[in-house]
Amino acid sequence: MKRFMDEDFLLDTETAQRLYHEHAAKMPILDAHSHIHPREIAEDKRYRNLAEAWLADDHAKWRLMRANGVTEKTITGGSTPGRERFQAFAEMMPKAVGNPMYDWAHLELARYFHCHVPLSGKTAEEVWQQAGIALSQPDMTAQGILRSSRVKVLCTCDDPTDDLRWHKAVKQAGCETVVLPTFRADAALTIEDPEWENYMKYDLGQAADVDISTMADVREALHRRLDYFAAQGCRIVDCSVECVRYHEVEEFELDDIVGKYINGKGT
């Protein structure tokens, strides 16, 4: 019987198999969008279990768990045992068939943890134990995994207010992978968010040393942070914009909008 998600998964023809195994699989990875925190790389973190490796800070996995009715305490609660959190994730997986996460999770189980069984509530303990054995190996650290995966460049997602201290620490640690920040400016673009005022005044404004009250101030603050990021090697702006709306207005109208949200003085 063919093994579940074997080395030829999605490679349905001989040509596809040859192109991948003889060429693509050997090429270095340039990852332009990663959710790995640079601190984990700088400290060469060793993950104790799959809950730490998968569920500590992965919003895509969290969204699926929420959609399956898992409580927020179980998903993000710091007091929830890792094994319990992983069980909830495993019980959700059979319902995720057709979602890219189903393929991603099982490909990782196969490639990094040598586990080839479909993840479910019934197989959770078996997968947990097998992954634990794999994670205990000397090279299964944050930098070790990047090295074995041939990741040449990795770009993290970073808010414009980030001081990028951990990117500097990665360089000092001598990591073989080049780790660069990306300018993730979502918080600056979501003016409808109730926290936008505080973000602009106390987060972005303070980070850029700009007293924000007009649209020109917003631009100046973002430009300063862009310059700071660029000095640390950033070359990518990564924004989640569902649709682009355009309406031509005068500069004073933009100032009114910003003023209304920042200090209640706009009209």
Stretch-by-stretch model annotation:
Residues 1-267:
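Metal-cofactor-binding active-site regions of metalloenzymes
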